[in-house]
Amino acid sequence: MLNQTSYHGAGAIEEIVNEAKAHAFQKAFVCSDPDLIKFGVTGKVTGLLDKEGLAYEIYSDIKANPTIDNVKNGVAAFKASGADYIIAIGGGSSMDTSKAIGIIIANPEFEDVRSLEGVAPTKKPCVPIIAVPTTAGTAAEVTINYVITDVERKRKFVCVDPHDMPIIAVVDPEMMSSMPKGLTASTGMDALTHAIEGYTTKAAWEMTDMFHLKAIEIISKSLRGAVANTKEGREGMALGQYIAGMGFSNVGLGIAHSMAHTLGAVYDTPHGVACAMMLPIVMEYNADCTGEKYREIARAMGVEGVDQMDQAAYRKAAVDAVRKLSEDVGIPSKLEALKEEDLPFLAESAHADACAPGNPKDASIEDLTELFRKLM
């Protein structure tokens, strides 16, 4: 599944007003987080709307890990606004909140977002969304997934719904240039995790393999430059993360994401950081169920001489390349907040996560406990 239309490259946001007019939209519900508004990123889009006299209302009650209340408040605000479409500006938090709001508005029988967990049984398409990513990582602009945090129960839940695909994606690297180094690094590693998990998931097949390998190659070449805020790095990451999204949205992910969701819910660990920590650990665990795929991962990441390596060597080379990239962009390999007494809850939550069944190697609660322990 893909967007009806997508625009890529510097200046792509100029197309937003053209699309709004072409669809005869009357008023935009602009979802964006407070920091993007504060630092003028959201204003790059609303300024275009102002120039053309297009009506909009801004909703900014969005946390980094969006909550049930963020969605509930957003639904009420949308109803009061008189808007007929959504412009989602931001990273995964803004995108996921927008998808949940749009789905509930179109399918009011699912007023409680928790009822949408798993493969959602909605019948109507989401309110039209124009998605404008400001991070290069989540690829939420081209996926059918969204993740919401249940603060009370200390868990994240994944909703999968073909009806929530944004109709238009506007991937403009200039909207990502203000990302600080840490956020660039973590969202970039999230994108790499999407590509590698999508490539190795049980549902992977030839067409998605093509997307994922190309994404691994582009991300591996671009992330260090993006962290240094080079034009080439930003452009590469904008494209690479989108291609990864084209792949994994159709085949799912694995336990690196299941475990990252749990760490985010319990410790509020940034999602990309949690993915970066878990990815090499999970790759080691999965290695014996991946055939020759790690050879291709290593090759895509620029490792030389992979054709001369035996299976153990190229599998190690792939994991080492991931660890080196994560280290180079400044992401820690250990989680100081992790406590031994939390391990049972963490493992049970990860085991129940919607991403877990796609992992190439089945993982028991005991297996997940030991994998979490490697972060200590």
Give residue ranges: language-model regions.
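C-terminal charged capping/lid subdomain of soluble metabolic enzymes
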Residues: 294, 298, 304-376
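Short glycine/serine/threonine-rich phosphate/pyrophosphate-binding segments
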Residues: 13-16, 38-41, 68-71, 94-98, ...
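Carboxylate- and glycine-rich phosphate/diphosphate-binding segment that chelates Mg2+/Mn2+
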Residues: 145-251, 366
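ATP/NTP phosphate-donor binding region
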Residues: 1-85, 335
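Catalytic phosphate/nucleotide-handling subdomain of diverse soluble enzymes
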Residues: 262-301, 376
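Glycine-rich phosphate/pyrophosphate-binding beta-alpha loops
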Residues: 137, 242-275, 353-358
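Glycine/threonine-rich beta-strand-loop-alpha-helix active-site module
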Residues: 69-174
